């Protein structure tokens, strides 16, 4: 009798994606992050669902409803901190996944890469509107500052901001619609992730060498299912350690103060995973220029495949490109640190230099060094 998993219309899809999928035999642990992102998404949707059962999206009760979840709901504090720290784990996996793609040339799968960039933008939007929901000081002022950036758009800016706010300031209407967005976006992310996977399975996975691996494939199950389970255990262990020992390590103490439109916090800053982009935004003294730089810092990923000048796909055998890649990582860490610092000397100049270096590395230095490496191959 033929196996049902190969004939049943639904099972066949799952079988071709997770069981009998031909996979390169040499993909490293950097290829674990895709499945970890799927796990993060499932955890966020589940914890978020249980939080939504007790949360009220109203300016007068939002803050106290979060306090009620933490104090009165059975294991409410646990669900709340799993959700908050789950977002941090999500972004750690996301950045590792993108870094892997950059290092090993996975961006040459253009459809997969472009949907990935779209996924990144959607996840960032979800995290931003989600941060507003507890209605603490940083929630309110973060929402005010970031939505206000849209007023830099010529002619329609102010109208656009007031349209998003649903009034003349961040208020009840804003909170309600942000809750609606925060509820719907994860399902859009799930659909996009399925399309991301669909396009990936059209070409098959890349591998560390960047060389086609069609002649050496192994089935996804059991080899990579067991490898993914190991990665998942590490992820869950880290998340539980963070949630149970230091739940507020990555949060902002200002968010334990209820939102007050009459009192501005000393330092308005987003969650840690947006700090690099925030630093780039702040490093330009012009409002419109800053907004454009902020947008470009993320959208630059779309242009990566066009900037490929190397004859080799992966950086595995390109030491000079490797050096620039790790310089880029160090630069992003510097920007993340600067984004959390006050706007004063010497942080301003360091932020400006790091921002210039970020764009210079991606747009100029890496393509140039790739060309030099091509020449060196002929020696």
UniProtKB/Swiss-Prot annotation:
Heme b b562 binds at residues 83, 182. CDD domains: cytochrome_b_C (cd00290), Cytochrome_b_N (cd00284). The keyword Transport applies. Its main location: mitochondrion. It comes from the Eukaryota. Heme b b566 binds at residues 97, 196. Pfam families: Cytochrom_B_C (PF00032), Cytochrome_B (PF00033). Signal peptide: none annotated. The keyword DNA-binding does not apply. The chain crosses the membrane at residues 33-53, 77-98, 113-133, 178-198, 226-246, 288-308, 320-340, 347-367. Binds 2 heme b groups non-covalently. A ubiquinone binds at residue 201. Its cofactor is heme b. InterPro entries: Cyt_b/b6_C, Cyt_b/b6_C_sf, Cyt_b/b6_N, Cytb/b6-like_sf, Cytochrome_b, Cytochrome_b_C_euk/bac, Cytochrome_b_N_euk/bac, Di-haem_cyt_TM. Keywords: Electron transport, Heme, Iron, Membrane, Metal-binding, Mitochondrion, Mitochondrion inner membrane, Respiratory chain, Transmembrane, Transmembrane helix, Transport, Ubiquinone. It is found in: Mitochondrion inner membrane. GO terms for molecular function: metal ion binding; ubiquinol-cytochrome-c reductase activity. One of its GO terms (cellular component) is mitochondrial inner membrane. GO terms for biological process: mitochondrial electron transport, ubiquinol to cytochrome c. It is a multi-pass membrane protein. PANTHER family: CYTOCHROME B. Belongs to the cytochrome b family. Heme 1 (or BL or b562) is low-potential and absorbs at about 562 nm, and heme 2 (or BH or b566) is high-potential and absorbs at about 566 nm. The cytochrome bc1 complex contains 11 subunits: 3 respiratory subunits (MT-CYB, CYC1 and UQCRFS1), 2 core proteins (UQCRC1 and UQCRC2) and 6 low-molecular weight proteins (UQCRH/QCR6, UQCRB/QCR7, UQCRQ/QCR8, UQCR10/QCR9, UQCR11/QCR10 and a cleavage product of UQCRFS1). This cytochrome bc1 complex then forms a dimer. Component of the ubiquinol-cytochrome c reductase complex (complex III or cytochrome b-c1 complex) that is part of the mitochondrial respiratory chain. The b-c1 complex mediates electron transfer from ubiquinol to cytochrome c. Contributes to the generation of a proton gradient across the mitochondrial membrane that is then used for ATP synthesis. This is Cytochrome b. It comes from Sagmatias cruciger (Hourglass dolphin).
């Amino acid at each position: 009798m033929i196996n049902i998993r190969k004939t049943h219309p639904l099972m066949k899809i799952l079988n071709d994606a997770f069981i009998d999928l031909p996979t390169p035999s040499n993909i490293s642990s950097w290829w674990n992050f895709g499945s970890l992102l799927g796990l993060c998404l499932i955890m966020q949707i589940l914890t978020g669902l249980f939080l939504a059962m007790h949360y009220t999206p109203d300016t007068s009760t939002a803050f106290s409803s979060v306090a009620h979840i933490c104090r009165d709901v059975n294991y409410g504090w646990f669900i709340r901190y799993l959700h908050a720290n789950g977002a941090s784990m999500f972004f750690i996996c996301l950045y590792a996944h993108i870094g892997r793609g950059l290092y090993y040339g996975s961006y040459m799968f253009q459809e997969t890469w472009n949907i990935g960039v779209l996924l990144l933008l959607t996840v960032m939007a979800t995290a931003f509107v989600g941060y507003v929901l507890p209605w603490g000081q940083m929630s309110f002022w973060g929402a005010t500052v970031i939505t206000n950036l849209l007023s830099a758009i010529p002619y329609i800016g102010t109208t656009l901001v007031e349209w998003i706010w649903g009034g003349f300031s961040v208020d009840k209407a804003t909170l309600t619609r942000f809750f609606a967005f925060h509820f719907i976006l994860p399902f859009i992310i799930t659909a996009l992730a399925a399309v991301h996977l669909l396009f990936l399975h059209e070409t098959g996975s890349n591998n560390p060498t960047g060389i086609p691996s069609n002649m050496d494939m192994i089935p996804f199950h059991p080899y990579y299912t067991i490898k993914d389970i190991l990665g998942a255990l590490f992820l869950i262990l880290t998340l539980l350690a963070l949630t149970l020992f230091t739940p507020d390590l990555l949060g902002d103490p200002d968010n334990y103060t209820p939102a007050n439109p009459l009192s501005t916090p000393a330092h308005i800053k987003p969650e840690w995973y947006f700090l690099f982009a925030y630093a780039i935004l702040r490093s330009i003294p012009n409002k419109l220029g800053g907004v454009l730089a902020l947008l470009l810092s993320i959208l630059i990923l779309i242009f990566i495949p066009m900037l490929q000048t190397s004859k080799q796909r992966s950086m595995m055998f390109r030491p000079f490109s490797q050096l620039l890649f790790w310089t880029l990582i160090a630069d992003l860490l510097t920007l993340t640190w600067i984004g959390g610092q006050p706007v004063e000397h010497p942080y301003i100049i360091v932020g400006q230099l790091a921002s210039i270096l970020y764009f210079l590395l991606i747009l100029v230095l890496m393509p140039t060094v790739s060309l030099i490496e091509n020449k060196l191959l002929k020696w």
